[in-house]
Amino acid sequence: EQYLATEYYNLPLLGQLYGGKGELNLETLLGSGAQVVIDVGEPKDTIVEDLDALQEQTGIPFVHVSATIETMGDAYRKLGELLGMEEEAETLATYCDETYAMVKDVAEHVEKANLLYITGDAGLNVIAQGSYHAEIIDLLSNNLAVVDSPSSKGTGNEVDMEQLMLWNPDVILFAPDSVYASVGDDPLWQSLTAIQNGSYYEAPMGPYNWMGFPPSVQRYLGMLWMAKLLYPDAADYDLQAEVTEYFDLFYHCALTGEQYEALMANSIGKQ
Protein backbone atom coordinates (compact mmCIF):
# COMPACT_ATOMS: atom_id res chain seq x y z
CA GLU A 1 0.00 0.00 0.00
CA GLN A 2 2.91 2.39 0.61
CA TYR A 3 3.52 2.58 -3.14
CA LEU A 4 -0.03 3.00 -4.45
CA ALA A 5 -2.57 5.81 -4.28
CA THR A 6 -5.29 5.31 -1.69
CA GLU A 7 -7.99 5.40 -4.39
CA TYR A 8 -6.91 1.91 -5.46
CA TYR A 9 -6.97 0.26 -2.03
CA ASN A 10 -10.62 -0.78 -2.05
CA LEU A 11 -10.99 -1.94 -5.64
CA PRO A 12 -12.58 -5.41 -5.85
CA LEU A 13 -10.26 -8.42 -5.89
CA LEU A 14 -11.22 -10.47 -8.92
CA GLY A 15 -8.69 -13.29 -8.66
CA GLN A 16 -6.67 -14.65 -11.56
CA LEU A 17 -7.58 -16.23 -14.85
CA TYR A 18 -4.29 -18.14 -14.80
CA GLY A 19 -1.67 -18.70 -12.15
CA GLY A 20 -1.42 -20.35 -8.79
CA LYS A 21 -3.35 -18.06 -6.42
CA GLY A 22 -6.91 -18.99 -7.20
CA GLU A 23 -9.50 -18.75 -9.88
CA LEU A 24 -11.24 -15.75 -11.36
CA ASN A 25 -14.20 -14.82 -9.14
CA LEU A 26 -17.04 -14.42 -11.63
CA GLU A 27 -19.53 -13.27 -9.00
CA THR A 28 -17.27 -10.40 -7.94
CA LEU A 29 -16.51 -9.62 -11.57
CA LEU A 30 -20.18 -9.40 -12.50
CA GLY A 31 -20.86 -7.13 -9.53
CA SER A 32 -17.93 -4.84 -10.26
CA GLY A 33 -19.48 -2.97 -13.17
CA ALA A 34 -16.60 -3.91 -15.46
CA GLN A 35 -17.28 -3.10 -19.11
CA VAL A 36 -14.33 -5.06 -20.48
CA VAL A 37 -11.74 -7.50 -19.11
CA ILE A 38 -8.22 -7.27 -20.51
CA ASP A 39 -5.70 -10.04 -19.95
CA VAL A 40 -2.10 -8.95 -20.59
CA GLY A 41 0.84 -11.29 -20.84
CA GLU A 42 1.70 -14.72 -22.17
CA PRO A 43 -0.75 -16.13 -24.73
CA LYS A 44 -1.59 -19.55 -23.30
CA ASP A 45 -2.36 -22.34 -25.75
CA THR A 46 -6.04 -22.23 -24.79
CA ILE A 47 -6.37 -18.44 -24.49
CA VAL A 48 -8.90 -18.04 -27.31
CA GLU A 49 -11.17 -20.81 -26.07
CA ASP A 50 -10.86 -19.68 -22.45
CA LEU A 51 -11.71 -16.04 -23.13
CA ASP A 52 -14.51 -16.90 -25.55
CA ALA A 53 -16.09 -19.13 -22.89
CA LEU A 54 -15.84 -16.43 -20.21
CA GLN A 55 -17.23 -13.81 -22.55
CA GLU A 56 -20.22 -16.01 -23.32
CA GLN A 57 -20.70 -16.83 -19.65
CA THR A 58 -20.56 -13.25 -18.37
CA GLY A 59 -21.65 -11.13 -21.32
CA ILE A 60 -18.55 -8.98 -20.77
CA PRO A 61 -16.01 -8.61 -23.61
CA PHE A 62 -12.68 -10.32 -22.86
CA VAL A 63 -9.52 -9.19 -24.67
CA HIS A 64 -6.01 -10.63 -24.60
CA VAL A 65 -2.97 -8.44 -25.26
CA SER A 66 0.25 -10.38 -25.73
CA ALA A 67 3.25 -8.90 -23.93
CA THR A 68 6.86 -10.01 -23.60
CA ILE A 69 9.71 -7.94 -22.23
CA GLU A 70 10.58 -7.06 -25.83
CA THR A 71 7.04 -6.14 -26.92
CA MET A 72 5.74 -4.46 -23.77
CA GLY A 73 5.82 -1.07 -25.48
CA ASP A 74 3.50 -2.31 -28.22
CA ALA A 75 1.24 -3.84 -25.57
CA TYR A 76 0.83 -0.42 -23.94
CA ARG A 77 0.05 1.14 -27.29
CA LYS A 78 -2.68 -1.46 -27.84
CA LEU A 79 -4.05 -0.78 -24.37
CA GLY A 80 -4.07 2.93 -25.17
CA GLU A 81 -6.15 2.26 -28.29
CA LEU A 82 -8.58 0.03 -26.41
CA LEU A 83 -9.08 2.47 -23.55
CA GLY A 84 -8.90 5.74 -25.44
CA MET A 85 -5.75 6.74 -23.54
CA GLU A 86 -3.24 6.91 -26.38
CA GLU A 87 -1.19 9.78 -24.96
CA GLU A 88 -0.73 8.23 -21.53
CA ALA A 89 0.00 4.85 -23.09
CA GLU A 90 2.64 6.26 -25.40
CA THR A 91 4.56 7.68 -22.44
CA LEU A 92 4.71 4.23 -20.86
CA ALA A 93 5.39 2.52 -24.19
CA THR A 94 8.32 4.81 -24.93
CA TYR A 95 9.74 4.11 -21.49
CA CYS A 96 9.50 0.36 -22.10
CA ASP A 97 11.10 0.57 -25.54
CA GLU A 98 13.98 2.72 -24.35
CA THR A 99 14.62 0.76 -21.16
CA TYR A 100 14.58 -2.58 -22.95
CA ALA A 101 16.98 -1.26 -25.61
CA MET A 102 19.34 0.06 -22.93
CA VAL A 103 19.43 -3.21 -20.99
CA LYS A 104 19.65 -5.33 -24.15
CA ASP A 105 22.70 -3.31 -25.17
CA VAL A 106 24.32 -4.16 -21.84
CA ALA A 107 23.55 -7.85 -22.37
CA GLU A 108 25.13 -7.81 -25.81
CA HIS A 109 28.45 -6.41 -24.59
CA VAL A 110 29.26 -8.54 -21.56
CA GLU A 111 30.38 -12.07 -20.79
CA LYS A 112 27.21 -13.41 -19.21
CA ALA A 113 27.31 -14.82 -15.70
CA ASN A 114 26.50 -18.49 -15.07
CA LEU A 115 23.41 -18.07 -12.94
CA LEU A 116 20.38 -19.70 -11.36
CA TYR A 117 17.17 -18.04 -10.19
CA ILE A 118 15.86 -20.10 -7.28
CA THR A 119 12.41 -20.08 -5.72
CA GLY A 120 10.44 -22.07 -3.16
CA ASP A 121 10.40 -22.54 0.60
CA ALA A 122 13.23 -25.07 0.38
CA GLY A 123 15.08 -23.34 -2.45
CA LEU A 124 14.59 -26.34 -4.71
CA ASN A 125 12.69 -24.76 -7.58
CA VAL A 126 14.31 -23.03 -10.53
CA ILE A 127 13.00 -20.78 -13.29
CA ALA A 128 14.04 -22.74 -16.35
CA GLN A 129 15.68 -21.41 -19.48
CA GLY A 130 13.17 -20.75 -22.24
CA SER A 131 10.14 -20.25 -20.01
CA TYR A 132 8.05 -17.07 -20.08
CA HIS A 133 9.03 -16.30 -16.49
CA ALA A 134 12.72 -16.58 -17.41
CA GLU A 135 12.77 -13.84 -20.05
CA ILE A 136 14.97 -11.37 -18.18
CA ILE A 137 17.08 -14.15 -16.67
CA ASP A 138 17.80 -15.53 -20.14
CA LEU A 139 18.48 -12.04 -21.49
CA LEU A 140 21.04 -11.10 -18.88
CA SER A 141 22.72 -14.35 -17.90
CA ASN A 142 23.69 -17.84 -18.91
CA ASN A 143 20.69 -19.46 -17.24
CA LEU A 144 21.98 -22.87 -16.20
CA ALA A 145 18.49 -24.23 -15.47
CA VAL A 146 18.03 -26.28 -18.63
CA VAL A 147 15.26 -28.87 -18.26
CA ASP A 148 13.24 -31.03 -20.63
CA SER A 149 9.90 -29.33 -19.94
CA PRO A 150 10.18 -25.75 -18.63
CA SER A 151 7.24 -24.97 -16.35
CA SER A 152 4.90 -22.16 -17.30
CA LYS A 153 4.23 -21.50 -13.60
CA GLY A 154 5.92 -18.79 -11.62
CA THR A 155 7.05 -21.38 -9.09
CA GLY A 156 9.23 -22.95 -11.79
CA ASN A 157 10.55 -26.50 -12.02
CA GLU A 158 11.29 -28.57 -8.93
CA VAL A 159 14.81 -29.98 -8.70
CA ASP A 160 17.01 -31.46 -5.96
CA MET A 161 20.21 -30.34 -4.30
CA GLU A 162 22.23 -32.79 -6.35
CA GLN A 163 21.10 -31.04 -9.53
CA LEU A 164 21.97 -27.63 -8.08
CA MET A 165 25.44 -28.97 -7.32
CA LEU A 166 25.82 -30.25 -10.86
CA TRP A 167 24.88 -26.84 -12.26
CA ASN A 168 27.04 -25.10 -9.60
CA PRO A 169 26.29 -21.49 -10.61
CA ASP A 170 28.65 -18.59 -10.08
CA VAL A 171 25.69 -16.38 -9.10
CA ILE A 172 22.36 -17.24 -7.47
CA LEU A 173 19.35 -14.97 -7.31
CA PHE A 174 16.76 -16.04 -4.75
CA ALA A 175 13.09 -15.17 -5.00
CA PRO A 176 11.63 -13.18 -2.11
CA ASP A 177 10.61 -15.40 0.82
CA SER A 178 12.87 -18.23 -0.30
CA VAL A 179 15.95 -19.44 1.61
CA TYR A 180 18.27 -16.47 1.06
CA ALA A 181 18.59 -15.71 4.77
CA SER A 182 19.68 -19.22 5.79
CA VAL A 183 21.92 -20.57 3.02
CA GLY A 184 25.05 -18.78 4.19
CA ASP A 185 25.13 -20.92 7.34
CA ASP A 186 24.04 -24.18 5.73
CA PRO A 187 26.93 -26.61 5.02
CA LEU A 188 25.06 -28.19 2.10
CA TRP A 189 24.46 -24.86 0.38
CA GLN A 190 28.04 -23.84 1.17
CA SER A 191 29.20 -26.47 -1.33
CA LEU A 192 27.93 -24.22 -4.14
CA THR A 193 30.42 -21.76 -5.62
CA ALA A 194 27.97 -18.84 -5.51
CA ILE A 195 27.34 -19.30 -1.80
CA GLN A 196 31.03 -19.82 -0.98
CA ASN A 197 31.90 -16.58 -2.74
CA GLY A 198 28.99 -14.56 -1.38
CA SER A 199 27.61 -14.09 -4.88
CA TYR A 200 23.98 -14.60 -3.95
CA TYR A 201 21.20 -12.07 -3.69
CA GLU A 202 17.49 -11.78 -2.98
CA ALA A 203 15.32 -10.24 -5.67
CA PRO A 204 13.69 -6.97 -4.61
CA MET A 205 10.02 -7.11 -3.66
CA GLY A 206 7.75 -4.09 -3.80
CA PRO A 207 4.97 -3.87 -4.55
CA TYR A 208 5.54 -7.17 -6.39
CA ASN A 209 8.50 -9.44 -7.15
CA TRP A 210 10.74 -7.57 -9.59
CA MET A 211 11.77 -10.77 -11.36
CA GLY A 212 8.34 -11.72 -12.57
CA PHE A 213 5.84 -13.18 -10.11
CA PRO A 214 3.56 -12.12 -11.68
CA PRO A 215 5.49 -11.58 -14.96
CA SER A 216 4.27 -8.04 -15.51
CA VAL A 217 5.84 -4.76 -16.58
CA GLN A 218 7.48 -4.69 -13.16
CA ARG A 219 10.09 -7.00 -14.69
CA TYR A 220 11.62 -3.83 -16.11
CA LEU A 221 12.71 -3.03 -12.57
CA GLY A 222 14.17 -6.52 -12.41
CA MET A 223 16.07 -5.95 -15.65
CA LEU A 224 17.54 -2.69 -14.40
CA TRP A 225 18.52 -4.19 -11.05
CA MET A 226 19.94 -7.42 -12.51
CA ALA A 227 22.03 -5.67 -15.16
CA LYS A 228 23.49 -3.22 -12.63
CA LEU A 229 24.14 -6.00 -10.11
CA LEU A 230 25.92 -8.33 -12.53
CA TYR A 231 27.61 -5.83 -14.83
CA PRO A 232 28.04 -2.55 -12.93
CA ASP A 233 30.54 -1.06 -15.38
CA ALA A 234 28.55 -1.89 -18.52
CA ALA A 235 25.27 -0.81 -16.93
CA ASP A 236 26.25 2.84 -16.90
CA TYR A 237 23.27 4.32 -15.10
CA ASP A 238 22.16 5.34 -11.63
CA LEU A 239 19.96 2.47 -10.42
CA GLN A 240 18.23 4.54 -7.75
CA ALA A 241 17.35 7.22 -10.30
CA GLU A 242 16.01 4.58 -12.70
CA VAL A 243 13.91 2.91 -10.01
CA THR A 244 12.58 6.26 -8.82
CA GLU A 245 11.56 7.15 -12.38
CA TYR A 246 9.72 3.85 -12.76
CA PHE A 247 7.74 4.31 -9.55
CA ASP A 248 6.80 7.81 -10.63
CA LEU A 249 5.65 6.74 -14.10
CA PHE A 250 3.82 3.54 -13.29
CA TYR A 251 2.65 4.02 -9.69
CA HIS A 252 2.58 7.84 -9.43
CA CYS A 253 4.65 7.33 -6.30
CA ALA A 254 7.44 9.65 -5.21
CA LEU A 255 9.81 6.96 -3.96
CA THR A 256 11.87 8.15 -1.00
CA GLY A 257 15.49 7.31 -0.38
CA GLU A 258 14.44 5.33 2.69
CA GLN A 259 11.99 3.27 0.63
CA TYR A 260 14.65 2.60 -1.98
CA GLU A 261 17.11 1.40 0.65
CA ALA A 262 14.46 -0.92 2.08
CA LEU A 263 13.79 -2.39 -1.36
CA MET A 264 17.51 -3.03 -1.82
CA ALA A 265 18.14 -4.39 1.68
CA ASN A 266 18.96 -7.96 0.59
CA SER A 267 19.56 -7.27 -3.08
CA ILE A 268 23.14 -6.04 -3.20
CA GLY A 269 24.74 -8.90 -1.29
CA LYS A 270 25.75 -9.63 2.27
CA GLN A 271 27.40 -6.58 3.79
What label would you give each PLM region?
Residues E1-S32, V36-K44, N142-A145:
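A short, structured surface patch at a secondary-structure boundary
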Residues Y18, V126-T155:
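Alpha-helical, coiled-coil/dimerization segments enriched in small aliphatic residues
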